């Protein structure tokens, strides 16, 4: 049972996941530790959960989120190996570090312990994330509990670990490119006379609604695009310009560059 939840790291992504988890779990069962204690204390005050030190999280929590950057993971886990090895009860580690395999996390932790590897994205901070995950040595019951705890963060999808880096390039890196697109749409609106705030609002809501239509209709994006383009209309003229400028190829190249 994943009754107690700990976070080692309370940065942007760790904080976003902690906020989501505290909506599904009793905050009094959530423990936060961070290299800068003040950051953990501020988040704990916001959420009504507890603060402690890394060793206490490693020794007491059933589900431990490893919420540090990949280059900091070994430094985080090395001092905790003995504590983890001496635990009498079962625990699950959850890593959100890009590029670190489950096997590498287990090696750093010093044991073949249960691990869930997740690839969240920044929209998880508003409950609209797309989070891929894969597991090792995790029971079906533990996975079900984990999914319940993570549900407030957004959609979760199990993928083979061999695909999780590619998935992250689409949904993890993708928000940055969507923000660029929203900014460019707003710039175009301003060039046509719209106030900046209105142009940004219209662009962002349009992207939100368009994405919802793709997900809920089940239609191919190309079919939805065709439905907007009237013969000889203004939309198809804009589509023509984007095709001439190489939008599709540029986006595909961005995904591939991020993957490589």
Could you say what each language-model-derived stretch is?
Residues 1-59, 128-129, 190-192:
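NAD(P)+-binding Rossmann beta1-loop-alpha1 motif at the extreme N-terminus of oxidoreductases
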Residues 17, 37, 47, 55-130:
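Rossmann-like NAD(P)(H) cofactor-binding subdomain of soluble oxidoreductases
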Residues 30, 40, 73, 195-203, ...:
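Small-residue helix-packing motif on alpha-helices
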Residues 104-114, 130-166, 178-216:
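Internal alpha-helical scaffold of NAD(P)-dependent oxidoreductase catalytic cores
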Residues 115, 164-169, 221-226:
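Short pre-catalytic strand/loop immediately N-terminal to key active-site residues, enriched for Gly-Thr
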Residues 204-260:
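NAD(P)-dependent Rossmann-like dehydrogenase/reductase catalytic/cofactor-binding core
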